[in-house]
Structures are given as structure tokens and as C-alpha cells.
Amino acid sequence: MNTADPRKRFPRSARVRTRAEYSTVFNGARRVSDPLMTLHWLPADRPARLGLAVSRKVDPHAVGRNRIKRVLRDALRQTRTDMQPGDFVVVARSAARNASNDDIRQAFLRLLRRLRALPTPGVDGTMPPPDGIATPSLTEPAPRSGTAEPAR
């Protein structure tokens, strides 16, 4: 039995399933590409759903095609709560056959960020300091400590 966090599962409602749904996404979606895959996104009012197209041209062996799909489903499962709503369809390219699982995952996340469907991660050190901690001013010179003002 799957005891994973229910918010991290990949339920039927999170999938693009029918030919009509795929056609709607392909005909009206924004598209971005990468050497490993193409991502189509059709914004909608419902939570993010994922469709996968991994043909035999990508990998003639079912094991390889299933690995690519498994990695992409897992990436969606981990990031679904942060994603913009809508339908996403990934069309894998033949370069994905030789890519590592991490390369496939990173390519998927990179494409989501390019579509602005996933927020970009913050860089360490970019957060403002907590209240009560003085920060140097960029517009005023720093006060000199230990020197008295000149007499007039």
C-alpha cells in the first residue's frame, strides 16, 4: 500500500488522459523546448495535470520509456503544489534515453521555470535581514567610528 503523503501522490485527476485533452493542449498551449524534451502548457482553473508522450523513437525498449515517464511523474508529484494551475504535456526527445534521472528532472524543472509555471528558487543571501539588525546603507557613507567631528 502507498503510504506517501496524499498531497504528493499522482492521482487520476492529476493526469491528462484522453485524446481530446491532449489535442486541446497541443493546439492552444505555450511551448518551450530543451534538448531532452518539449513542454506544452495550457493554463486552466484546475490544479496542475500532467500528460506524457514518450514514443518508441525516444527509446525502443519499454524499460527506458517507463523510466523517463517515472522520473517526470515523480518530479511533478514533488512540485505540483508550487506549480501554476493548468495542463502540462511533456513530449520526450531521443536525447532523454541517454540522460540520467537527475538530468531529466532538472530539464523538466528548468522548462517549468521558463514558462513561469514554477517559481524560481531563491539564491542564498538574497533574503532581507531580520528586524532589528542594522544593514549598511548603499546611498549614505558609513559613519566613522572613533573620530571626532572637526572643530569649526
From Swiss-Prot:
Name the reaction it catalyses.
Endonucleolytic cleavage of RNA, removing 5'-extranucleotides from tRNA precursor
Q: MF terms per GO, please?
A: 3'-tRNA processing endoribonuclease activity; ribonuclease P activity; tRNA binding
Q: Which GO terms describe its cellular component?
A: ribonuclease P complex
Provide an example Pfam family for this protein.
Answer: Ribonuclease_P
Which InterPro entries did the record assign?
Ribosomal_Su5_D2-typ_SF (IPR020568), Ribsml_uS5_D2-typ_fold_subgr (IPR014721), RNase_P (IPR000100), RNase_P_CS (IPR020539)
The EC category is hydrolase
Q: Does the keyword Magnesium apply?
A: no
Q: What is its EC number?
A: 3.1.26.5
UniProt keyword terms in alphabetical order: Endonuclease, Hydrolase, Nuclease, RNA-binding, tRNA processing
- Give the family from UniProt: Belongs to the RnpA family.
Q: How does it assemble?
A: Consists of a catalytic RNA component (M1 or rnpB) and a protein subunit.
Give the matching PANTHER family. RIBONUCLEASE P PROTEIN COMPONENT
* Function noted in UniProt: RNaseP catalyzes the removal of the 5'-leader sequence from pre-tRNA to produce the mature 5'-terminus. It can also cleave other RNA substrates such as 4.5S RNA. The protein component plays an auxiliary but essential role in vivo by binding to the 5'-leader sequence and broadening the substrate specificity of the ribozyme.
Protein name, entry field: Ribonuclease P protein component
What gene makes this protein?
Answer: rnpA
